């Protein structure tokens, strides 16, 4: 099979997987999401104990709410960063408890670059990576823009990439492409 046909086949499979997993996500009610999110936040707090640099994410409705973990790290004086989309890639910026986040064109809360410090990917110790789906061996199905893949390629080998998902987002297998960057660890409810 030619490379172009293979890429087309993989992309088609990813579209199908995204639809199937999004359908599963719609079965979670608010209480189930909150309980699962609390479990995930507690696991993250237990995992990341040392004062570290952490790239988190601002959860959207279909993602686990990790805000309690973020608040814990902020109060414990960790260097907490959030991603901001700039063109076709993301940059990490520091945030603090008093920061006013701004809404991106996609409705995601991002740091205001005018009152935040840009942090290089090589300065991050832990990266919390959202996704539509994950396999147990770390393959990640994102939203299709490649933003996280591009960012993760720039990190140091010792940076721990942690996939964050509800347990119903875990899939058995998935084909990937060369540019797809896996996570090192998966945290679910």
Language model features: what each stretch is:
Residues 2-123:
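N-terminal active-site beta-alpha-beta segment that forms phosphate/nucleotide-binding
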Residues 4, 91-189:
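Conserved phosphate- and dinucleotide-binding cores of soluble alpha/beta proteins
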């Amino acid at each position: 099979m030619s490379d172009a046909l293979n890429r087309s086949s993989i992309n088609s499979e990813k579209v199908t997987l995204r639809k199937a997993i999004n359908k599963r996500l719609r079965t979670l009610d608010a209480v189930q999401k909150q309980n699962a999110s609390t479990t995930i936040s507690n696991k993250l707090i237990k995992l990341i104990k040392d004062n570290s640099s952490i790239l988190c994410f601002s959860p959207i409705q279909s993602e686990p709410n990790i805000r309690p973990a973020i608040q814990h790290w902020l109060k414990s004086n960790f260097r907490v960063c959030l991603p901001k989309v700039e063109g076709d890639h993301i940059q990490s910026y520091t945030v603090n408890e008093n920061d006013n986040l701004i809404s991106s064109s996609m409705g995601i809360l991002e740091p205001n670059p005018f009152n935040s410090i840009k942090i290089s990917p090589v300065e991050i110790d832990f990266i919390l990576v959202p996704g539509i789906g994950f396999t147990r061996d770390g393959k990640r199905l994102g939203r299709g823009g490649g933003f996280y893949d591009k960012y993760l390629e720039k990190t140091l080998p010792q940076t721990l990439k942690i996939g964050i998902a509800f347990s119903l987002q875990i899939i058995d297998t998935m084909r990937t492409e060369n540019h797809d960057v896996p996570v090192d660890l998966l945290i679910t409810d």
